[in-house]
Structure formats: structure tokens, C-alpha cells
Amino acid sequence: MARNIGLDVPIPETECEDVNCPFHGTLPVRGQVITGKVVSDRMNGTVVVEREFLHYVKKYKRYEKRRSRYHAHSTPCINAGVGDVVRIAECRPLSKTTNFVVVEVMTE
């Protein structure tokens, strides 16, 4: 049975046995919720999500494009792949670099 994680996201239809799943496991989510594009899924159970944003440069009165990358845990019930636009939520540290978990695949 899936539990409510406190975010307005649809609950996945398939169930998984992952302990670090926010829906079927015991992982609590809190903090930031970020939308980005999956650029790599080659790690086991982890995806790299890239977010582009505009940063204002005061000296030139212009905007420049910047991007940041986040490592996010991808559970078997969500199954995010390269090119998917996903929503990730902050959680406790799962490894040295992984502090986020995928909670929704918005577009494939």
C-alpha cells in the first residue's frame, strides 16, 4: 500500500520493495522540490537530473544560462530514463552525493 508523501504528485500504479522509496518504503521527503531533465541513468538505482536557469549579471545588465546537476535515487516503481522530465524532492543523504529522490515522471 502506498503512503501519502505530502506532495501533490500521483502515486505510482506498480509497487516496489525498495526501502528508499518515498511511496512504498520508509524514506521521508522534506525541503526542496526541483523539476529537471534526466541526462544519465547509468548508475544502479540513481539518475542525474540537470536543471537550467537564468542568472542575472549586474555589470552587463544581461542574463546568462547556468545549469546544475543533482544525483537522485530512482525507484523501480517510477523508472525514470534519459530524456524524461522529472520532479525530485529532497530527502536525507542516501550516499555521498545523493540527497534527492525522484517522485514523479512528468513527461517522457
From Swiss-Prot:
Q: Which organism is it from?
A: Methanoculleus marisnigri (strain ATCC 35101 / DSM 1498 / JR1)
> Self-association or partners: how does it assemble?
Part of the 30S ribosomal subunit.
* Protein function: One of the primary rRNA binding proteins, it binds specifically to the 5'-end of 16S ribosomal RNA.
Q: Which UniProt keywords apply?
A: Ribonucleoprotein, Ribosomal protein, RNA-binding, rRNA-binding
Q: Which InterPro entries match?
A: NA-bd_OB-fold (IPR012340), Ribosomal_uS17 (IPR000266), Ribosomal_uS17_arc/euk (IPR028333), Ribosomal_uS17_archaeal (IPR019978), Ribosomal_uS17_CS (IPR019979)
PROSITE patterns, alphabetized: RIBOSOMAL_S17
Q: What Pfam families does this protein map onto? A: Ribosomal_S17
A GO biological process held by the record? translation
Please give the Gene Ontology molecular function terms for this protein: rRNA binding; structural constituent of ribosome
The family note in this entry says: Belongs to the universal ribosomal protein uS17 family.
> What pairs make up the disulfide bonds?
none
Q: Which protein, by its recorded name, is this?
A: Small ribosomal subunit protein uS17
Q: Which GO terms describe its cellular component?
A: cytosolic small ribosomal subunit
